Amino acid sequence: WDPLEEIIIGTADYANIPIPNISVMKCQFPEYEEEYVRKHTGFYPQQIIDEQNEDLDILSETLGKLGVVVHRPNTQYANSPCYSPNWNGKNWHYHCPRDLTLIIGNKIIETPSPIWNRQFETWAYREVFSKLYEEGYDWIKAPIPILHDENYKEDTRGVPALNNEEILFEAANCVRVNEDILYQVSNTGNEKGGQWLQRTLGSNYKVHITEDLYSYAHLDSTIVPVKEGLVVYNASRVTLENEPEMFKSWDKIWIEECANIENAPFGLPWGASEWIGMNFLSVNSQLAIVDKKQAMPIKFKNGKR
């Protein structure tokens, strides 16, 4: 709950839709046919990339004016192939530094994504991590997964896509609240990943594994802690029956819907979640940066209408 001091803001440079493979189809596009995805592979339209970079630059400048140290990714390898003895692909994007990096106490943890195309994504942040390591942080990388086909369920409709074969999860499957970490089993994290995280962190932290909130991917459009004692819930996914025990005594803000956005511009077949408006960035316990179109969360300034 301390004020934000340092952050990595991503970039839209080289953002693309990857050529379909089992990991992309099972974890990212389970509702689409492979041939449909294949028709739309390649870089996003340049206008989307330029407009998003403009927004990210403004966000970076805003945070800098608030006294936050801002880092940006090194895109040297962004347009490069990535491969292992078991698979090959191409690096995806550097939109989301949060997705694959956990900062817990003085530990930097690079997490093992189940998606082929994300295995080298954290290379973009190595300079930042190296600096923090020199300052005394512990720097941990989870075991590099083989990502054989047995990791992915045959039928993923409405259920998490991953079997419990390897340690697989993304950092954005987690929400940390003091010494408690809520861990979501989904298309981007299996139970074994939560077990590994608990063993790695030891007895100073408690990892709470949940499977009944949202099976698609990350937690940050489902549950967002604002400050100690106040949490935002996605009302379409969280109920009083399935809410995590760690939040039962907290005040709740229930978001019934987000403002409409142009979900799939330029004729693209998909876009952001309809709940993307729940993504906001807390600078301190009294200040959050919110999409200006999202009147619903803005109404609840300081937890009140």
Regions found by a protein language model. Name each.
Residues 1-305:
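The feature marks the mature, well-folded catalytic cores of soluble enzymes
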